[in-house]
Amino acid sequence: KPLKRVTESDMDQCMKLNVYSAISAIQGFQENLKNNNGSIVLFSSVAAQKGFANHTIIASAKAALEGLTVTLAAEFAPSIRVNCLAPSLTESKISQSMLKSEVVAEALAKAHPLKRLGKGNDSASIAKFLLSDESSWITGQIIGVDGGRSRLS
């Protein structure tokens, strides 16, 4: 939604859903994570760093999660690793209405260097890796899962 239509209530709702809920969940599990050399994976969006028109609300909330990621990675090291995935548009129930039109879906896919939209497994497999011991030397990272959209033309 354009900035001129953004309300404080819109911002509050998005921040509660994305940032405050993450903080609350992490606080609730912090001791358990610390005692078990745990790992946290947060979810941002390519919109937090790329800059898209009409993404004021979600980009702000997701950028806050990216800040939270690096701050908590520093605070919790060495006992808890914290990373963040930043996917681009992914085929899902949430994006279904946007992708109804084949023309729109094709245009959105072409905006990505890999010429397709994301699938749930694209992010899930990386999250699984980050939560495993195989990623024991990775923390404080924002990882684009975006078909190259954030870094390539």
Label the predicted regions.
Residues 26, 61:
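Active-site helix of classical SDR
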Residues 31, 73-78, 136:
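Alpha-helical segment proximal to the catalytic Tyr-Lys
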Residues 50, 128, 139-153:
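Short C-terminal tail/terminal secondary-structure segment
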Residues 112-123, 134:
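A conserved structural motif in NAD(P)-dependent oxidoreductases
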